[in-house]
């Protein structure tokens, strides 16, 4: 959520930055109109409360019963007016908040202008689009031939966009998750194991609601929601708390399965495991002071890149343009790995600084020094990495002509020393 003070003091600047992301500035005028109503109502409530206090004092000094009763009646009338104004104020505040929750974050000045992902800028690349000395097979062919991905039984169990990992495939999935977590511990993160379901308020705090409601799974009876990413529970880990500056920065890493309805157009990524309703992801999350946040973003990016580097996968890093920037983000890097079987770069990490956007929603604050007024934290999040696209890249880059798949060296200790998944 944006800072109402910024909207009040610099409405034209807020409109200009929103326009870079294609957002109509009329929403700013709407917020300001509600804000004017709110401030007027607050003034009227306070004025009447002051009048009521004056009348109350006068009643105590009155001796004439008729005059005293008239003042009591006047005080009751003021009380009724205050109650009515309070109801109006609550309604206006709710309307203003509803509008503000729909407004995206403002892009950082470094973010390039653009319409969609075609305008994203490659800022770093390590490795080339690997060409194998034999016809590269896509992961779904490799997986079915080796018996490590079972699409038919996944559909039987849960419907389309679900699959089963079996044998060495399931073991590879578990190995990648464990290795990623261990790498991030080495990089200075603390592991957190969160619930995989959350309250609705937690989704509002992270910015998933209201925008992405139709993409989320919810249990109607309990009112709990399945997490679409570990970012959601991690955002609210310290909600409504005031941290000491000495506790910051806080770096967390968490593994969760992720659940998304993700309505896809027919024919798009229909084969394989690239897009599914359930997938695994290891998430990095940072709580930092405002002066640390852009240095923290560079660390987040480096830590995600290191995952691809140690796995021996060709990768590149893109700076997202305004047209492809996420709802809550001010600046985002995407890390993509090359997959020769499908012949495309696959996004395995998206590293974003959201500044105080989530902190305002979740009421995440810190005290800069003892006795100082609490301020909002900045938060950052990044995949480290997302599966199954990492699995796709491993399978397709490490495939052999005989259909077997070599295990990257860093993963072998996590697979009991296994070096190859063979027919």
Curated annotation (Swiss-Prot):
Subcellular compartments: Cytoplasm
PROSITE patterns reported for this sequence: AA_TRNA_LIGASE_II
Enzyme class: ligase
Alphabetical list of CDD domains matching this protein: SerRS_core
GO biological process: selenocysteine biosynthetic process; seryl-tRNA aminoacylation
Pathway per the UniProt entry: Aminoacyl-tRNA biosynthesis; selenocysteinyl-tRNA(Sec) biosynthesis; L-seryl-tRNA(Sec) from L-serine and tRNA(Sec): step 1/1
Binding-site residues, L-serine: 229-231, 283, 383
Pfam families (UniProt xref): Seryl_tRNA_N (PF02403), tRNA-synt_2b (PF00587)
UniProt function note: Catalyzes the attachment of serine to tRNA(Ser). Is also able to aminoacylate tRNA(Sec) with serine, to form the misacylated tRNA L-seryl-tRNA(Sec), which will be further converted into selenocysteinyl-tRNA(Sec).
Similarity-based family: Belongs to the class-II aminoacyl-tRNA synthetase family. Type-1 seryl-tRNA synthetase subfamily.
Protein's recorded name: Serine--tRNA ligase
Organism in which the protein naturally occurs: Chloroflexus aurantiacus (strain ATCC 29366 / DSM 635 / J-10-fl)
